[in-house]
Amino acid sequence: MAHDPVHDEDVAEVSHLTAEAASALIRGDVRRYLTFIGHADDYTLLQPFGGEPRRGFDSSDEALEATARFFHGGDAHVEVIESYASGDLVVLVVIERQHGEVGDLPDQDWSLRVTLVFRREEGGWRLAHRHATPLVHPITLEQAAALARGS
């Protein structure tokens, strides 16, 4: 089904939903996160901890509860660096400036550089892809080499 062209208002809506979702997630409020962001059936994730790409979004109660336990007491502000729109896609390049308790670690800066690809589907905008890296702060070539080696 053909949709109307993407307008500035669509990009603003997706940006707003992204900011609300980031704030909810870093607080561990996964169910609230899901009120802002729906995931496409072919969703892919390149998570900030590395590893193989994830395919699909596990919305089982067990997965949502595990995610909720992983994040605590944080706050986030999303800085949109650039946005692109074409056809039924909106791409956001953002920095999620956030802090919180992640895993068993105390509260700290967890800011991420993130690329998000949203696709317009029946029922609204769905997140099709997320690529996040924690490299908001510069690192040395040697540190990058160690990360690339997996050490």
Q: Residue spans of the language-model regions?
A:
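Short, cysteine-centered beta-strand-loop-beta hairpins and adjacent loop/turn segments enriched
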Residues: 70-71, 99-108
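Short beta-strand edge/turn micro-motifs at domain boundaries
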Residues: 110-141
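A short, polar/proline- and glycine-enriched secondary-structure boundary/capping micro-motif
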Residues: 102-105, 137-143
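Hydrophobic/aromatic beta-strand elements that line small-molecule binding cavities or substrate pockets
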Residues: 21, 78-83, 96-98, 113-119, ...
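Residue-level preference for beta-strand/loop junctions
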Residues: 88, 92-94, 109-110
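Short, low-complexity N-terminal intrinsically disordered segments enriched in polar/charged residues
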Residues: 1-36, 146-151
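A solvent-exposed, acidic/Ser-Thr-rich amphipathic alpha-helical stretch
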Residues: 30-87, 95
